[in-house]
């Protein structure tokens, strides 16, 4: 360990962080890293595997809780935020990581239901979680929201996914501008 690393406090010490899509991949890595940096992790996913992630974090000495939810609905997002607030009394950081390409094919081969499913999976969880956590962050005039997007916003054979992640980029910029006076 370098002197710099050893001499500084963990970056997330004393912070409560909601991580969505925390059962695997990037979300799991983010949850584990935040816990290793002293953060309290509220890991959310629709997969029950999220409990295994939390078990691993707590076994390593971290503080974490798991919550299963369908974040494609506002009710699911609001329920997750409400549960985090009930358990930890606050949310300092929200990391939105839900999403992923379902199909890869030329755009003209997508059916209406497939397009809607891609948008629902890769845009709505971020949209709803931001909406659910904002009232709390606005009230305390402080908070951090990290929205994970993708370079695939400019790719072929994933047009609905690209559109959804482009929407995440627009949502991120708009919320940042709208909430700048609120410390978010």
Name these PLM-found stretches.
Residues 135, 177-181:
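Alpha-helical segment proximal to the catalytic Tyr-Lys
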Residues 60-63, 83-94, 102-103:
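A glycine-rich helix->loop->beta "capping" turn
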Residues 86, 101-116, 139, 157-160:
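Conserved mid-core segment of classical short-chain dehydrogenase/reductases
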Residues 51, 68-80, 112:
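The beta1-alpha1 cofactor-binding region of Rossmann-like NAD(H)/NADP(H)-dependent oxidoreductases
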Residues 92, 108-127, 142, 146, ...:
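Catalytic Tyr-X3-Lys loop
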Residues 150:
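Residue(s) in the substrate-gating loop at a strand-loop-helix junction
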Residues 130, 164:
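Active-site helix of classical SDR
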Residues 9-42:
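Canonical Rossmann dinucleotide-binding motif of NAD(H)/NADP(H)-dependent dehydrogenases/reductases
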